[in-house]
Design a protein with these regions (language model features):
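Short beta->alpha connector loops at strand-helix junctions that form conserved
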Residues: 28, 54, 74-75
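Metal-dependent nucleic-acid phosphoesterase active-site entry motif
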Residues: 1-13, 106-119
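Ribonuclease/tRNase effector modules and their secretory precursors
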Residues: 18-19, 37, 65, 83, ...
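Short glycine-/acidic-enriched loop or helix-start segments at secondary-structure transitions
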Residues: 14-15, 36, 60-62, 83, ...
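Short, hinge-like loop/turn segments at secondary-structure boundaries
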Residues: 42-44, 67-71
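Acidic, metal-binding active-site segment of PIN/NYN-like and related structure-specific nucleases
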Residues: 43-61
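N-terminal first-folded block
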Residues: 2-48
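C-terminal structural segments of small proteins and small subunits
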Residues: 71-113
Length: 119
């Protein structure tokens, strides 16, 4: 699956997810942070699921109907576990993400919000 990792996601997650067969771009490799709205736009344009720790992306998608290609928000996981958790969500919820779902993942809990604004 094509992914765009937000700068707040541990940089080591890029290599781990790439090794698992995903096509991964990490915004931390860029010379500057384009900001939330532009980052979500890039993910939508490139049809990449955005992976973040930041709840602002959900607000952009839900309240402001900013188009996206799916969002995974990781809450409460140590940096070194982010890729593992993301990989489990990608494997278990591929159809939902392909349909533009916003998935919030916390230890012991997964919340899925289908999106009508998917790219």
């Amino acid at each position: 699956m094509k992914l765009l990792l937000d700068t707040c996601v541990w940089g080591g997650a890029k290599a781990q997810l790439t090794s698992a067969g995903h096509e991964v771009v990490w915004a931390g490799d860029w010379s500057e942070d384009p900001g939330d709205q532009k980052l979500l736009g890039i993910a939508a344009r490139e049809v990449r699921v955005l992976v973040t720790l930041d709840k602002d992306f959900g607000e952009l998608a839900v309240l402001y109907n900013v188009p996206h290609a799916g969002i995974i928000r990781l809450v409460g996981f140590r940096s070194v576990r982010q890729a593992e958790v993301c990989g489990r969500i990608l494997a278990g919820y591929e159809k939902e993400l392909a349909a533009g779902a916003l998935i919030t993942v916390e230890p012991g809990r997964v919340r899925i919000r289908p999106s009508s604004s998917a790219a």
